[in-house]
């Protein structure tokens, strides 16, 4: 499932965000690429909004299962995403799922805590197309933005979640 896909992949980052689109974490050519963070994000998920990219593979690998979050039943089964880092197991609660335009405000990098994060998260929550329960955000929250291709070069499917543990 999606949780296993994220857990298995190393989150990669390099100055060119497109580098890992068609390379493994060992930098070997591979059509599926790997799951990787935006090149401007900290590798430890320490930014207020960390953007994570992965291909929408038909075989379900990488972020191929992200499209399942277009169906309300998927969220009803589990509204959480877990990410394993070398230091901790992080649990995130999904608050928004939608199709975004490439280069839209969805891809705003927010480095540190503050009111800007709350405003951003509230705006992204309003884009949700599944009718998820509204939540309150805090200036210290950590958000992840999972982004994958849709088959349309102008859009991406996005699932956003806020860290709830630890």
Show where each model-derived region lies:
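Single conserved hydrophobic/aromatic residue that forms the stacking wall/gate
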Residues: 1-14
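Extracytoplasmic/periplasmic soluble domains downstream of a signal peptide or transmembrane helix
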Residues: 15-166
């Amino acid at each position: 499932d999606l949780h296993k896909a994220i857990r298995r992949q190393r989150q990669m980052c390099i100055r060119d965000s497109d580098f890992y689109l068609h390379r493994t974490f060992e930098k070997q050519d591979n059509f599926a690429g790997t799951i990787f963070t935006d090149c401007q994000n900290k590798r430890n998920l320490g930014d207020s909004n960390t953007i994570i990219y992965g291909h929408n593979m038909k075989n379900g690998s990488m972020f191929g299962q992200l499209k399942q979050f277009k169906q309300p039943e998927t969220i009803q089964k589990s509204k959480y995403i877990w990410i394993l880092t070398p230091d901790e197991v992080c649990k995130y609660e999904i608050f928004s799922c939608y199709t975004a335009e490439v280069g839209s405000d969805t891809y705003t990098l927010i480095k540190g805590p503050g009111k800007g994060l709350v405003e951003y998260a509230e705006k992204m929550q309003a884009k949700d197309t599944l009718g998820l329960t509204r939540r309150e955000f805090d200036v210290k929250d950590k958000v992840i933005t999972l982004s994958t291709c849709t088959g349309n070069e102008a859009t991406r499917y996005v699932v956003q979640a806020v860290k709830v543990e630890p």
